[in-house]
Amino acid sequence: MWRSLQPGRFRNAGWTLFEVMYEMHVPVSFSFDVSIVIVSLNTRDLLRECLQSVIRTGSSLRIQVIVIDNNSTDGSAAMVEQDFPDAVLIRSKVNLGFGRANNLGFQSARGRYVVLLNSDAFLTAGSLERSVAHMDANLQAGIGGGRLIGPDSSMQPSARMFPTVLNDLIVLSGLAARFPQSKFFGRFDRTWANELECAEVDWVPGAFSIIRADALAQVGNFDPRFFLYYEEVDLCRRLKRKGYSVWYWPDITVVHIGGQSSRQVPSLETSRAGAQITLWRMRSMLLYYRKHHGLLARFAMLMELVWYWLQARRRQLSRDPERRNTAYVARLHVSMMGRAWRDTRGGRLSPAQPW
């Protein structure tokens, strides 16, 4: 199996450690080619399959596997200890979200490259070797990703443009879905592009990506203010500002189910209509826009707020009963956006975590 290091002081990490998780990640030495960092929250069976996919790759690389358990209650940590004893298991006493949990894993990473792998994502044969080969061949590449496909082999968004008010408006309006082959309207998800051609892009999803450890040391870890969503967008932007490039490589294929951990935490009044996800996304969107675009955070929020308010009004006045019922969904989105604005004070601060 893989070779691993012991987690040491991070095995039963508590909350006080995480205030320093944004500090520079400086590898002591590169004992491995790749450190695979996997964050899991109540995804025991998927996590088992994910770890088995790492083994099935049969890679000749020196691989370190690090699993961060985000205070699961389904026996995930015990399963890792029993079935995958060579993995570095880090138990968090609280749900750290995506960014902070990965930051904790980065502290134990000793690979030349760090691979982010969701617990509901599965490597295919040769994916690790090709990832490392691409990074070795392009020293300016700070981070790269591959083709994300669903269990039914359907293509998932695997490389995107940075969020802007214009890009958000195109997606909200439905024009991106209506004209996916348009280079203008399909710009955010790059739906116009040939999925079989490699390309330099703005950012790649955190479900699977490979990061140069030296580059991570220069720009720092994930910004801990992002509990979930936008953390990888922020990291890619910081890497680009340091002169590194971000790449999409289609010869790397990863099967991704998607959204499993984010569905495991009950909160708010209910999780109906994706209210919880909307709240988390809007909080992170405001933090991101405020950090990188200043006062544009207000315009981004206002645009989406007005859009959903208009949708709620239109659906409420519809003669179609089913369409009128969906007005609740739009109203709930409006409510969550208002709460996100209050919680973050317009993107100026991150609410107490876990969200």
Cite the ranges covered by each PLM segment:
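Glycine-rich, basic loop-to-helix element that forms the pyrophosphate-binding segment
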Residues: 92-109
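Conserved donor NDP-sugar-binding/catalytic core segment of glycosyltransferases
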Residues: 125-158
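Active-site-adjacent helix/loop segment of glycosyltransferases
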Residues: 241-324
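A short, conserved alpha-helix in the catalytic core of glycosyltransferases
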Residues: 196, 202-221, 225-253
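Short aromatic/hydrophobic "clamp" motif used to bind/position activated sugar donors
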Residues: 114
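A conserved acidic beta->alpha catalytic loop
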Residues: 53, 69-77, 94
